[in-house]
């Protein structure tokens, strides 16, 4: 009795179909992985720029010779999320918390709980002359002619160029509250008196 030949079915085999599905899944996985990495890179880039790369311009010569008029500084916006401003820090703040006011750049000379007074051109903190002072005699004492006691959230700031600075000595500025501070000025771009570099 003659054997009947089996007919081969047309179309792709089961193994080929499984291979094609596996290939498509791998491509999809690689695409999703690439999209995820791009998203992470963009997110980190934006976060770094926001945290360390926001710029502010110095207005006037109140911070000379360290910073000159029009010189740009970079703001570290997360520095004071983990620690408080320290004496000697150069900060960026909005005077009186006014969102429409131009950002101001000044140096912290006294911190919460300190007493401040300007006596005969000398800045006196807690009864001692401010040793970190690199400025000339502070002729205009302003409101600091009388002793000032800083509250638990207040800072006393001055410009390095005391003869041309509107700062905490002025009744228009006064003590700076923590909520007014945008961040720490940590890097300056090239200016007329200096190359780009970290702010000391």
Tell where the protein language model's regions lie, with residue ranges.
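Protein maturation boundaries and topogenic segments
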Residues: 1-102, 176-180, 184-200
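Beta-strand-rich cores of mature extracytoplasmic or soluble domains
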Residues: 144, 148-200
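PP2C/PPM family metal-dependent serine/threonine protein phosphatase catalytic domain
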Residues: 125-143
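Mid-length scaffold segments of soluble, non-membrane domains
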Residues: 103-128
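Solvent-exposed loop/turn segments at secondary-structure junctions
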Residues: 80-81, 97-99, 116, 123-124, ...
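Structural motif
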Residues: 71, 86-90, 114, 154, ...
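Short, surface-exposed secondary-structure edge patches
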Residues: 62-66, 79-84, 107, 113, ...
């Amino acid at each position: 009795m003659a054997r009947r030949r089996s007919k081969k079915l047309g179309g792709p085999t089961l193994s080929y179909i499984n291979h094609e599905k596996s290939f498509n899944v791998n491509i999809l996985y690689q695409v999703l992985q690439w999209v995820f990495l791009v998203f992470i890179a963009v997110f980190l880039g934006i976060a770094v720029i926001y945290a360390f790369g926001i710029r502010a311009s110095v207005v006037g010569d109140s911070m000379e010779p360290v910073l000159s008029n029009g010189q740009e500084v970079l703001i570290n916006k997360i520095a004071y999320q983990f620690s408080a401003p320290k004496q000697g820090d150069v900060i960026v703040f909005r005077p009186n918390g006014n969102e429409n006011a131009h950002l101001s750049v000044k140096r912290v000379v006294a911190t919460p709980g300190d007493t401040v007074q300007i006596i005969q051109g000398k800045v006196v903190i807690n009864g001692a002359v401010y040793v970190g002072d690199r400025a000339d005699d502070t002729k205009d004492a302003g409101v600091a002619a009388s002793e000032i006691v800083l509250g638990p959230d207040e800072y006393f700031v001055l410009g390095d160029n005391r003869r041309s600075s509107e700062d905490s000595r002025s009744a228009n500025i006064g003590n700076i509250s923590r909520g007014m501070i945008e961040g720490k000025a940590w890097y300056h771009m090239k200016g007329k008196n200096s190359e780009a570099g970290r702010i000391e």
